[in-house]
A protein has these predicted regions:
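N-terminal Rossmann-like FAD-binding beta1-loop-alpha1 element of flavoenzymes
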Residues: 5-35
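Conserved Rossmann-like nucleotide-cofactor binding loop
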Residues: 15, 41, 178
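Glycine-rich FAD pyrophosphate-binding loop
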Residues: 24-59
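N-terminal FAD cofactor-binding segment of flavoenzymes
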Residues: 53-95
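Conserved FAD-binding catalytic core of PHBH/FMO-like flavoproteins
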Residues: 71, 162-165, 170-274, 278-281
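Conserved N-terminal helical subregion
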Residues: 80-184, 192-197
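FAD/FMN-dependent oxidoreductases across multiple families
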Residues: 248-342
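C-terminal helical "tail/cap" subdomain of flavin- and related membrane-associated enzymes
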Residues: 329-416
């Protein structure tokens, strides 16, 4: 027997669960929303509050100040902020050049420029908030194995914990950059390889970071260090994202710890004293992957399935959250006017509202690394003057920070 659901979200990662929370809060109570995830989801916890389990090697995500505003609007920020590391200052520099700039949260009357959160804590907090909300049906482990667009909706077939056939008014595809469902629907992707790899790890320094995030551009590629909460024993931790040529990344993934620390020290310098430890190292190839279509009648492609970005500016997840916020508002307005949620004009309205934000964020993340890696001496001087000039031109610096923090986008019409 075929069941009906107004909205089906395919993908229960951080974007999918955030989307479920947003829609659960903004759509009428009679709206049936399903979340389908291929891996087993955590079970509800008594009291609804997850426990924080610190780990030196925990992977992390940088949330912009704009993302904080979105999570506050969803009502989940109070839970999240128990175990976050605020970014009070951002230091941007260019190795071997004189240009640099400092950005301070206090200059903008913000509590922080952003926050670094461990993925395990973020995921646990969001899923428990979804259980407490009680508006979304979770189907896990299960997978959408067939999706056929029909008049008025999408016919879905699920396999896994619950084998089901569902007629969905709206299908939201949020199953990641390598989305199998996107491919199954015949939505093409545009991929641009950067011919670089990202090396990620957590590192320990002798000195505390004092809430400062570092973005250091080098001729090999950018080095980003994000402040993390201290590990057990008070170890001063930072999350490293190091962009490198594939062969260089491969070597540094496998080399002895002492050699790795020496190489990173030479690239980053001694702003945090001597490097003392590196945790588990991981690497992956970098590419800009964009869905050629984000909306069709009855379908929206979201998160990394829609646009997977270069990590240099940490904008991918924050852009996805802004997409979530705007889609929630557009669908709420459609429901209020009794317009079908999957109507193509409704979905085009969402895409039109987000297009400028998406284009600007993608272009910023795409062009920035190449700009700082080019060795042309005239261009190098212009880069130096540009970084130094941000400190000399407060209005330009404020606008730059507003966009980097995701605040400019969400204060425009159509945003939270």
């Amino acid at each position: 027997m075929t069941e009906y659901a107004d909205v089906v979200i395919a993908g229960g990662g951080m974007v999918g669960v955030s989307l479920a929370l947003q829609l659960g809060a903004s759509l009428p109570p009679q709206t049936r929303i399903l979340l389908v995830e291929g891996f087993p989801l955590p079970q509800p916890i008594a009291g609804g509050k997850p426990e924080y389990h610190p780990s030196f090697d925990a992977r992390s995500t940088a949330l912009s100040f704009g993302s904080r505003l979105i999570y506050e609007h969803m009502g989940v920020w109070e839970d999240l902020e128990q175990w976050l590391c605020p970014i009070d200052t951002i230091h941007v520099s260019n190795k071997g050049r004189f240009g640099s700039t400092l950005m301070h949260a206090v200059d903008y009357d913000w509590p922080a420029l952003g926050y670094v959160v461990e993925n395990a804590w973020l995921g646990s907090s969001l899923i428990q908030a979804l259980y407490r909300q009680g508006r979304v049906e979770l189907i896990s482990p299960a997978k959408v194995v067939s999706a056929v667009v029909r008049a008025g909706g999408v016919a879905l077939r699920l396999e896994g914990a619950r084998a089901m056939e569902i007629e969905a008014g709206l299908l939201l595809v949020a199953d990641g950059a390598n989305s199998g469902l996107r491919d199954q629907l015949g939505v093409a992707v545009e991929e641009k390889s950067y011919r670089q790899h990202a090396l990620i790890a957590n590192v320990a320094f002798a000195e505390p970071h004092r809430g400062c995030a570092y973005e250091r551009f080098t001729d090999e590629g950018p080095v980003a260090l994000l402040p993390l909460l201290a590990a057990a024993g008070g170890t001063h931790r930072a999350g490293l994202v190091w962009t490198l040529a594939p062969e260089r990344a491969e070597h540094l993934l496998k080399c002895p710890e002492a050699e790795f620390l020496e190489c990173l020290q030479e690239r980053f310098g001694y702003r945090l004293g001597r490097l003392q430890q590196v945790g588990e190292r991981h690497g992956y190839p970098l590419a800009l992957v964009q869905s050629a279509e984000q909306v069709r009648s009855g379908i929206v492609v979201m998160g990394n399935a829609a646009h997977a970005l270069h990590p240099v500016a940490g904008q991918g997840y924050n852009l996805a959250l802004r997409d979530v916020a705007v889609l929630g508002q557009v669908l709420a307005a459609a429901a209020q006017s009794s317009t079908p949620l999957g109507h193509i004009q409704v979905l085009k309205q969402y895409h039109d509202l987000q297009k400028a934000d998406q284009d600007q964020t993608v272009n910023f993340s795409d062009k920035l690394p190449a700009l700082f890696m080019r060795t042309d001496p005239i261009l190098g001087l212009l880069r130096d003057l540009g970084l130094a000039g941000l400190d000399l031109l407060p209005a330009a610096k404020r606008e730059f920070v507003r966009h980097a923090a995701g605040v400019a986008a969400i204060t425009e019409p159509g945003h939270v």
